């Protein structure tokens, strides 16, 4: 997360929350110089010690290690006044998020590594709160549920990612319910967890994850959007979707509804693969070919990230731009082979299937008590009632429209076969 004054000059993120349902504490980020350490306080206000700059990888990498060269950056863009995007990268063995005033080189811990991008919606203040709340809650839940878990296996890991995402959705939804001026707030979430040599992903909305191998960028998430539904139904082409005025309409988000559909997938990684997570402020303007070219020509993820942000801004920068880039290295990974496949691969496990009518097991009754009052400066621009109402109605109409379009399409297919 951007815990300092960012290079683009935008204002520092205001006070945030991190919910620990067992032992709640408040995570407050203050405007500090890049070299300073952010302050964490417990529920009594006591100062907590934080390792802001984890020890980098030793010069000598032990055999079998997986090494990550990672950088993340968020830019406000050319037209927005506020940045509603958020991100986090964290070693789940330690639980501390990494700072990114420089390129980080880290050994992957045995508990995995978290990469996440969130793109808020609902107006400047609401979107900013939703995205920051999402990354804080997901990280906090992974600290609680995963760091001390007795079973370290893919099913348990994916189940933890899913549960953390559900808690984030419930938290944002309940918080908006307690603050009428923020109703309709929501955020996308693209969450990737590296465990061993495999990425496990939880997807909500239309932020994206790409894997770049041998100079080719392949999307390994699937947009939960109107355009994606119409593409799958054969109504429009990918090229038509990219030009559509409705390409930014999403069908799933954290916060607007009490329950959310989470797309769970997985992808094995090889040595020299590059993971790119980004908000649609990047993917909507920069084509996969350009992403692949940038990370291939710029082996340093920091330089690649700067190049991609510059490309998006050169195209007008109409939205916030966030990118997380991780290059995978080390003897713990195999070299790529021709038989390896890259793509949207569903993680299918009976142990993760739960009835859609059953809410996640959460202590939501105590959520309001565990959220610290937010500072007044966070509400410099709150969404107007007209903006919130328009966005809410659009969401309902879009969902209904998708059902109608798909029904008519399949009916037409049946009639043409008679």
Tell me what each language-model feature is:
Residues 7, 16-19, 34, 48:
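Leucine-biased recognition of intrinsically disordered, low-complexity hydrophobic segments
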Residues 9-12, 40:
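Intrinsically disordered, low-complexity cationic segments
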Residues 25-418:
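PP2C/PPM-type serine/threonine phosphatase catalytic domain
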């Amino acid at each position: 997360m951007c815990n300092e004054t960012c290079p683009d000059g935008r204002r520092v993120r205001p006070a945030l929350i991190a919910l620990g349902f067992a032992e709640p504490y408040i995570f407050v980020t203050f405007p500090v110089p890049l070299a300073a350490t952010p302050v964490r306080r417990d529920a009594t206000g006591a100062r907590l010690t934080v390792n802001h700059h984890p020890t980098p990888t030793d010069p000598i990498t032990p055999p079998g290690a997986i090494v990550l060269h990672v950088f993340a950056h968020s830019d406000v863009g050319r037209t927005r006044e506020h940045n509603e995007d958020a991100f986090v990268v964290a070693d789940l063995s330690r639980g501390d998020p990494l700072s990114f005033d420089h390129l980080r080189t880290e050994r992957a811990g045995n508990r995995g590594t978290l990469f996440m991008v969130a793109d808020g919606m609902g107006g400047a203040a609401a979107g900013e709160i939703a995205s920051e709340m999402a990354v804080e809650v997901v990280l906090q839940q992974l600290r609680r549920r995963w760091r001390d878990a007795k079973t370290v296996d893919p099913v348990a890991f994916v189940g933890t990612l899913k549960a953390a995402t559900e808690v984030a959705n419930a938290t944002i939804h309940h918080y908006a319910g307690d603050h009428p001026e923020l109703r309709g707030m929501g955020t996308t979430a693209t969450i990737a967890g590296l465990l061993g040599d495999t990425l496990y992903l939880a997807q909500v909305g239309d932020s994206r994850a790409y894997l770049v191998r041998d100079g080719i960028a392949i999307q390994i998430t699937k947009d939960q959007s109107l355009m994606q539904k119409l593409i799958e139904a054969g109504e429009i082409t990918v090229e038509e979707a990219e030009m559509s005025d409705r390409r930014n309409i999403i069908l799933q988000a954290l916060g607007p509804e009490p329950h959310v559909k989470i797309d769970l997938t997985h992808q094995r990684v090889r040595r020299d693969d590059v993971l790119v997570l980004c908000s649609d402020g990047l993917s909507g303007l920069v084509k996969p070919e350009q992403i692949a070219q940038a990370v291939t020509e710029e082996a340093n993820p920091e330089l690649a990230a700067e190049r991609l942000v510059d490309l998006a801004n050169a195209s007008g920068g109409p939205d916030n731009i966030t990118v997380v880039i991780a290059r995978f290295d080390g003897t713990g990974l195999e070299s790529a082979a021709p038989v390896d496949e890259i793509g949207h691969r569903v993680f299918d496990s009976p142990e993760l299937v739960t009835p859609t009518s059953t809410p996640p097991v959460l202590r939501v009754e105590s959520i309001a008590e565990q959220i610290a009052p937010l500072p007044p400066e966070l509400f410099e621009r709150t969404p107007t009632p007209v903006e919130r109402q328009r966005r809410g109605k659009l969401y309902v109409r879009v969902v209904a429209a998708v059902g109608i379009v798909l029904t008519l399409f399949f009916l037409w297919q049946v009639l043409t076969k008679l």
